A protein has these predicted regions:
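Cofactor-binding loop segments of dinucleotide-utilizing enzymes, especially the Rossmann-like FAD-
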Residues: 29, 62, 194
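Short acidic-hydrophobic, aromatic-tinged amphipathic segments that line or gate anion-handling sites
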Residues: 6-9, 79-85
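Thiol/selenol-based redox catalytic cores and closely related redox-interacting motifs
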Residues: 84-206
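Short acidic, S/G/P-rich loop/turn micro-motifs used as interaction or catalytic elements
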Residues: 31-34, 65, 206
Length: 227
């Protein structure tokens, strides 16, 4: 299956994202969204392996240049690999989930989604952040968590990461989210082969659902990365 035309049109103007190599394109939600921060943090850890495998990377988020600068400074994501759109035009062209559209506006929709309404899997993922997950790698180097063991994601570990992200965003809300109009918009992931064939795609279904395998968000890349 060929990658969607709107996506190919966007990539055509991007240096290093032309056909002839594999490319990973991540459409983030708002830059201040939990999912965007967590996804970027996961990608940063895999940058050397992506480069070794010759896979080009581009992330496209909702926001502005000031927010993108702060987002990259906080997450460590390379600024040159992040584009921002003021409105989710490409998201819509690709048919990505716009989120729950509630009568009270975007904030009402967001709060309902946080409660799991119109956002499947959100509550289970929140719970996983507190309960720990032996299938997931550790996220924090801390004596406090080391008491609970090593080599896996300990109870409250992921919840602590998310709390830190929340504190960062809430302290700079208008930097990360210049407009509240699109706070429910979800993202998606597209992995293209050298000939523009779509190797993998995933469309987010809800909050804290940016991957099919949240315990290892980039597991879909395993067949394509250099060991």
């Amino acid at each position: 299956m060929r990658a969607p035309s709107p996506l190919l049109q966007r990539l055509a103007a991007m240096p290093g994202m032309a056909p002839g190599r594999r490319r990973l394109v991540v459409l983030l939600s708002q830059l201040g969204d939990f999912d965007s921060l967590e996804y970027a943090q996961a990608l940063v850890q895999s940058l050397p392996r992506l480069e070794a495998a010759g896979i080009g990377l581009l992330a496209i988020g909702i926001g502005d240049a000031t927010g993108a600068d702060r987002f990259c400074a906080y997450t460590g994501f390379p600024r040159e690999l992040l584009q921002v759109d003021a409105e989710p035009v490409l998201h819509r062209q690709l048919g990505l989930y716009s989120g729950l559209q509630a009568p009270g506006g975007p904030w009402s929709g967001l709060l309902l989604m946080c409660a799991g309404i119109g956002s499947p899997g959100t509550l289970a993922e929140v719970f996983r952040g507190y309960s720990g997950d032996r299938r997931a790698p550790a996220r924090l180097e801390s004596p406090l968590f080391a008491v609970l063991g090593r080599g896996y994601q300990r109870p409250f570990e992921l919840a602590t990461v998310r709390l830190r992200n929340m504190v960062e965003v809430l302290g700079r809300w208008r930097t990360y989210v210049p407009s509240d109009a699109y706070i429910t918009q979800r993202g998606g992931t597209f992995l293209l082969d050298a000939d523009d064939t779509l190797l993998y795609s995933y469309r987010d279904r809800g909050i804290l659902g940016f991957s099919e395998t949240m315990e290892r968000p980039l597991a879909f890349l395993d067949p394509y990365l250099v060991v």
